[in-house]
């Protein structure tokens, strides 16, 4: 079953006080222009569920989409885009950081990286920051179609090697993904679906004395 199929827009939020009361959430984040909106549209089989723009930094709020299992997917503002006023950028940073740090409903993070330029400084900082929450991270190496098959294999291997210190301390997984070629949809579904399954199992299990 495609977990993301038939996802529906729910609401958009610009302040933490306006966050909706939801069951469980998984969030999508990435550098501006890493292909986050295209990845969301591909996973949900929607043409324009998430706004795709040639202008980096277009996603400026926290957007909520309801999944068919009743839980939520959250599209967070992209990071690393400097061509906005300082006050706006500071607001994005605070909004993003406070949501990731304090949102109790959040069970995992999908981090989008351009397969041609993975693990940039801000991506590493995001991994370090999110590590403190103890929640899993799944990395989509987007735009994989821009690489040859050999380059894809080499890139995935290199990224896994570089992530080894992080995967030793927290649950981190990584895969290749292409919105253009519809590559990696099933793998992303399985990984994120397992997060919801684990959260449901933990919630239904009796507390130990």
Curated annotation (Swiss-Prot):
Biological processes, Gene Ontology terms: division septum assembly
Binding site for Mg(2+): 37, 59
Domain of life according to the entry: Bacteria
Keyword field contains Transmembrane helix: no
A GO cellular component annotation in the UniProt record: cytosol
Keywords of the record: Cell cycle, Cell division, GTP-binding, Magnesium, Metal-binding, Nucleotide-binding, Septation
Signal peptide: none
Required cofactor names: Mg(2+)
CDD domains: YihA_EngB (cd01876)
Domain named EngB-type G: residues: 22-198
Gene Ontology molecular function, alphabetical: GTP binding; metal ion binding
Cited function: Necessary for normal cell division and for the maintenance of normal septation.
Family: Belongs to the TRAFAC class TrmE-Era-EngA-EngB-Septin-like GTPase superfamily. EngB GTPase family.
Name assigned to this protein: Probable GTP-binding protein EngB
Lineage: Bacteria, Pseudomonadati, Pseudomonadota, Betaproteobacteria, Neisseriales
Encoding gene, per UniProt annotation: engB
